[in-house]
Amino acid sequence: NYLPKPSLTFHPLQFLSIILLIPGMQFFSGYLTSAVSLLFPNWLSQYEKLMETAGLDSDIELFMFIYAVILGPVCEELVFRGVTMRLVRRALPFWAANLMQAVLFGIFHMNWIQGIYAFVLGLVLGWICEKGGSIYFSMFFHILFNFWGTIIGPLLNNLKETDLLGIIIFLFTIVSLVLGFSLFRLGTKWRDQKAARLMAAPDHDDHFEAAE
């Protein structure tokens, strides 16, 4: 859905749920990265060197920020959720198409650390795109996810680590993920119900023109 009618495609709760999901997915990715790093320490050092070489460390420049937060997510969504998943979806069920694009998305990042959490992220992005019915949802999620990782994440790393903080973050991660996914499904349901009412209305064409 590249040219959506807002009344048919979007519901505010869907966007709010995505905002709620971002910190949970970021913290979950951090847990996953830590677990993989414990098993394969050399992967983490290779990843850190790659980020520094690419200019994506704490001293990120403006151009790299724009690329990492806006251009990269938009282009990646068009390629993996827009083209790849859409084409595979014609021949395979959603779960298979989503799995395939997520694997390719992980491989695309060309290092083990990023590849593993990019695979998980790809599954989530594919689900959001499919269930939401629009690639704009996965673009919105991807942009916010990268913004958090680029700006907010490094700021949080400056916090003093304590057992209490660790427990709070862990519990917040669970709440963020459960509520985020649940509210996205609810927002999609409400969006569909509203769209059905609008389609049933005699003057729905005029309403859509006004909404656009």
Predicted regions and their residues:
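Transmembrane alpha-helical segments in integral membrane proteins
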Residues: V69-V88, V178-K189
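Hydrophobic alpha-helical transmembrane segments
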Residues: F15-L20, L62-I66, W95-M100, G115-I116, ...
